[in-house]
Amino acid sequence: MTVYFIGAGPGDPELITVKGQRLIKNSPVILYAGSLVPREILDVAEGHAEKIIDTASIDLDEIMVHIEAAHAEGKDVARVHSGDPSVYGAIGEQIRRLEQQGIDYEVIPGVTATSASAAWLGKE
């Protein structure tokens, strides 16, 4: 069982990485911040995921309850964040809790809004 912190990119569902999209599609449990991550990014999981949970209105303790339940059942978790989860993300506090409990995790980078905006400007 692994928790995958997946960067969803700058908001355009077509800008998520191939690896991020594959992990979302294949993870039985998906936790995403609905206030920041467009629901369309999770469309690839429809019909595959057992649970898709919007974490925008719940706190870290509640998020951890969902992760711990998945861990107890041996199910991978896609924890989807906006942009790149390591840049202005809130994964540090989650990672500390996972490490305390011996739960494996992996960080999957996403396209940051900074990188995307440079491309959208069309300038060098």
Cite the ranges covered by each PLM segment:
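Class I S-adenosyl-L-methionine
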Residues: 1-116
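Anionic-ligand binding region
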Residues: 119-124
